[in-house]
Swiss-Prot record:
Residues 222-230 are cytoplasmic. It is found in: Nucleus envelope; Cell membrane; Lysosome membrane. Its main location: nucleus. The gene is atraid. This is All-trans retinoic acid-induced differentiation factor. InterPro entries: ATRAID (IPR042350), EGF-like_dom (IPR000742), LRR_dom_sf (IPR032675). GO terms for biological process: cell differentiation; negative regulation of osteoblast proliferation; negative regulation of protein catabolic process; positive regulation of bone mineralization; positive regulation of osteoblast differentiation; regulation of gene expression. Residues 1-26 form the signal peptide. PROSITE patterns: EGF_1. It comes from Danio rerio (Zebrafish).
Amino acid sequence: MTANVTVSSMYLFTVLLLLFNVYVNSQDTDAQLCQMCEGTIRHDSPVWSFCITKGYVKGHCCFKNNTSDVDTIIGLDLSNCSISHVEHLYNSSTALIIDLSNNPISNLSDYVFQGFSQLTQLLLPSKLECPGGRASWEKVEVKSITRICEGQKNACNQTVQMPLVCPENSLCSPYGPGFFECSCLNNFHGYKCMRQGEFPLVKVLGILTASTVVVSSVLWFTQRRKVKNT
């Protein structure tokens, strides 16, 4: 009984520690993104106009109002920030509007916006194409030096462009401009959603807990031997 309690306590502590680290890292990445360049969102920016009714401004980010998810980014304005290369946009996949215009960006991968399923407006330097191509947006236009991509289309409805078809017992859902993902329906799981029945959560957690205890015991025993030898 005591051993079971100890194992459960160790597992709970490990989970809590991992969740704490994830929370701290998300705070750091949010701060890094919102302070990528000096100042704050310009008052003549489309992101500012959007944010004054939907949320509040912090640095170059717009956060959602009236929600327990106080760190939910719904707008991002990195225009005129002298950005030449964009690899990722950290925790801003919940953004509805993003402005990257007036930057010397020469190339922008579509994968930067993978997971941005809620994005409805994207402003880019005019020489860049909208992620996913014109077919992924309801409206694409160029105004002066800015390309505006509006109204992200649901990739699941564009069967001609889909390189893969979701397997049986799964559901297609949008996953950013030109992207989609397949999620297993209720009561199905595993490879290609071929397994039916509840996911064996208790069994998996038991295996993970046992593995953690074994590895920890081996490391502890090894360290003890080193201490005794010295």
